[in-house]
């Protein structure tokens, strides 16, 4: 896997290429992910069925801003009302035929609400978990032992969490 770091104004952009990718990609998916760190722990989403961790988030819907997307996604997946306080960075991830544009926001918790999972999230057993940040970095740092699609995701998350520690 190859990584390139650039900037767009103040926003750092990390471009990662999986072992297998198309350039140009067949499709692009723009999404947002929230980073919440509290008492040395980071909030992650766990897909129990696949035993896969990732930062909570998902795709931007039509007419939605990036900030609105991260607020909605953390509400749906984690049952949290959040306030995005900083657009930390963007990770452009080329994996197979898709370019995944992941916008990461540092968020603060502003309350709780009811979770609303998609059918797919229900099926995969998506749930919010708080994990010690060092343990999360270790989990994601094992990306080379994963199959290619998960390795790409774990490298992305590993890169982002290390940026949060700086």
Map each language-model feature to its residues:
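Acidic, metal-coordinating catalytic segment for phosphate/diphosphate chemistry
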Residues: 1-33
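Conserved Nudix-box catalytic region and its N-terminal flanking loop in Nudix hydrolases
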Residues: 32, 37-76
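Conserved hydrophobic "DFG−1" position in protein kinase catalytic cores
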Residues: 36, 44, 106-107, 130
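Short loop segments at secondary-structure junctions
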Residues: 39-41, 108-113, 133-135
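A short coil-to-beta-strand element that immediately follows conserved catalytic motifs
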Residues: 81-89
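Active-site-adjacent beta-strand/loop module that shapes the phosphate/pyrophosphate-binding cleft
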Residues: 93-116, 129
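Nudix hydrolase/Nudix homology domain
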Residues: 121-166
